Amino acid sequence: FIGYNAFGSLVLGRPENGVLQPAARICTFLVSMAMVGVAEEFIFRSVIAQTLLEHFGTSRAGVWKACLLSGVLFGAAHLTNILSSAPFGVLMQCVFAASLGTLFAAIYFRTGNLWVTVFLHGAMDISSMLIGGLYGTTTVADAVSGYDASMLLSVLLYLIPTAVLLRKKKLPEVQLYWHQYVKK
C-alpha cells in the first residue's frame, strides 16, 4: 500500500509544470508526517491497544477484541478532521483508519515491537501526502475531503492480513511475548 500511495502520488498526482517546494519545507513535511506516526503509535498501540490487551487477556477472543476496539478508537480519533474537511470524506477516513489501526495492533502484538508500526505508519502518511509535501499543492484537509467510498476497500485490504497475523496457529507467538505483561 505504501508503494501504491507513492507511485500514485508521484506519477498520477504530480502537477503539470509543478515547482518543488524549498528543501526546508520538504524536510519539515517529512518530519511532520513521520512524527504523526510516532505520536499516534505511542498513544494508540503502546498505551491503548496494550491496555486493552491487558484487560481482555491473550486468549484468541481477547487479542481480537483488543485489536478491533483499539482500531475503532483510532478511527474515531480521526473524527476531529470534521472541523476542516468534508463530512463524507472524514467518515471514509475513519473507516480506513479503523481498519488500519486494527492491522497495526495485530502487527504490534505479533512482533512486540512498536517501532515496526511507527515506521509503517510514518511511511504511509508520507506516501499518501507526497505530492502535497513536495509541491505544496494539497493540504491534509483537501486530501481527506476527497476521500470517497473506494476507501471502504481498505477494510478488506487491512483485515485480511490482520486475520493472517492473528490466525490460530500464530496466536502462541502473541501469548509468549505478552504473557509477561498480561495476567489473564
Where are the language model's segments positioned?
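Membrane-interface helix/loop boundary segments of multi-pass membrane proteins
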Residues: 39-69, 106-113
